[in-house]
Regions:
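FNR/FR-type flavoprotein reductase catalytic core
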Residues: 69-160
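Ferredoxin-reductase
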Residues: 2-81
Length: 160
């Protein structure tokens, strides 16, 4: 775990009440896909845990859904805003324990951490396949991951 100050470089809507936030800062404590960060939000007592979608040494990408006061405040942040994060929390996924053709299955806000996992599996030469089954979708705007996948080189099967 490492505490650090990060700068918002992007905070954009990708689906109904769902945003992708990119933060610049020292992400060296994040070592496995599936880990999470705790975000300190000004004026609120408790930090908010948010899973890491993707990262590298100098950046963290979070995908979050606006469901309460904390995430509502996060959704209003603009590039240049500073956030205090605890990084490298949780055990994450053991990408080395997978077979040659891992199957990644997810839904809702549980899908974003699979992006970082798939990216690392593919970099290791594995043929990761994603399967997303969407239940009770009332509006296309409520589908969380399709926009991010549109620019992704990783194959996915999406069914509604």
């Amino acid at each position: 775990m490492k505490k650090g100050l990060f700068t918002v470089t992007e905070n954009v809507s990708i689906a109904d009440r769902t945003l992708r936030m990119t933060l610049a800062g020292n992400a060296s404590a994040i070592v496995r896909p599936g880990q999470f960060v705790n975000v300190e939000i000004e004026g609120l007592y408790l930090r908010r845990p948010i899973s890491v979608c993707d990262w590298d040494a100098g950046k963290v990408v979070l995908v979050y859904k606006v469901v309460g006061a904390g995430t509502q405040k996060l959704s209003r942040l603009r590039p240049g805003a500073a956030l205090d994060l605890l990084t490298g929390l949780g055990n994450g996924f053991d990408a080395g324990a997978s077979g040659a053709r891992p199957l990644l299955v997810g839904g809702g806000v549980g899908v974003p951490p699979l992006y970082g996992l798939a990216k690392r599996l593919m970099a290791a030469g594995k043929q990761a396949e994603w399967t997303f089954r969407l239940f009770r979708v009332t509006l296309p705007s409520s589908v969380v991951f399709i926009e991010m996948h549109g620019s992704s080189p990783y194959p996915a099967n999406i069914s509604i």
